[in-house]
């Protein structure tokens, strides 16, 4: 049965840095930032917060189409949500990854998550390569030593890469933006994510994001999971 869509957007300011809020069935999402495909600024930043990971594909799709997909930083933050949903439900997670990704990015993400989320006699649950907690590694406050327990609401902090925007030269048209997603799960805290915006669409897509699924530091203790 379809959930009731109880969404409301509340604009809390008029500038590009103004925070906006979106609600869906008791889950709250906010975004703030001035990252944009229209122009490059090395000082540009973005922040996304969320009280919960979307419960299912319906919520994820609504969030993307109506709110976070309209900004590069919102779209980049949604990849960690999609990775978590994939860990909970492979079919729904795959649909989420497909929804927000440039086609060539889908197999790259899914093939790695299958390995890192799966267990076998060669990769038991206590093996350092098995990293079900990987989606939490870019959430603010999550570190190996605290069991990758992030602060709440969950927060993804981003800033512009030193690499300027580029126009896609093959497989279509669009502006590719290079964004650093900050995370304490690796020695290199700046995790590069490429986001693309096509000229005929108001939505963004994740073009490439290997830094988000690269093996992070082994956890110390028990991962509590995400809400």
Regions picked out by a protein language model, each given a short descriptive name:
Residues 4-13:
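Sec-dependent N-terminal signal peptides
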Residues 108-184:
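Surface-exposed, charged secondary-structure patches
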Residues 11, 81-88, 182-186:
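Short, flexible beta-strand-to-coil junctions
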Residues 19-25:
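Cleaved targeting-peptide boundary
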Residues 14-18:
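Sec/Tat signal peptide C-region and signal peptidase I cleavage site
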Residues 22, 178-180, 185-226:
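Short beta-strand edge/turn micro-motifs at domain boundaries
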Residues 30-138:
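Core segments of small alpha/beta cavity-forming domains
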């Amino acid at each position: 049965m379809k959930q009731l869509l109880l969404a409301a957007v509340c604009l809390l300011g008029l500038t590009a840095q103004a925070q906006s809020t979106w609600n869906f069935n008791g889950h709250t999402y906010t975004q703030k930032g001035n990252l944009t495909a229209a122009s490059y600024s090395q000082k540009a930043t973005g922040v996304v917060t969320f009280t919960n990971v979307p419960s299912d594909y319906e919520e994820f799709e609504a969030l993307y189409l109506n709110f976070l997909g309209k900004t590069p930083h919102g779209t980049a933050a949604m990849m960690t949500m999609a990775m978590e949903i994939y860990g909970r439900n492979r079919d729904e997670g795959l649909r989420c990854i497909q929804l927000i990704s440039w086609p060539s990015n889908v197999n790259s993400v899914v093939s790695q998550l299958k390995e890192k989320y799966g267990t076998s006699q060669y990769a038991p649950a206590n093996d350092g390569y098995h990293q079900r907690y990987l989606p939490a590694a870019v959430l603010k406050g999550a570190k190996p030593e605290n069991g990758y327990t992030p602060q709440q609401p969950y927060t993804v902090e981003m800033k512009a890469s030193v690499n300027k925007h580029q126009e896609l030269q093959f497989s279509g048209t669009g502006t590719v933006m290079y964004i650093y997603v900050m995370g304490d799960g690796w020695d290199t805290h700046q995790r590069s994510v490429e986001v693309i915006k096509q000229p005929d669409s108001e939505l963004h897509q994740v073009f490439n994001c290997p830094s988000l699924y690269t093996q992070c530091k082994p956890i110390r203790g028990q991962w509590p999971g995400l809400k």
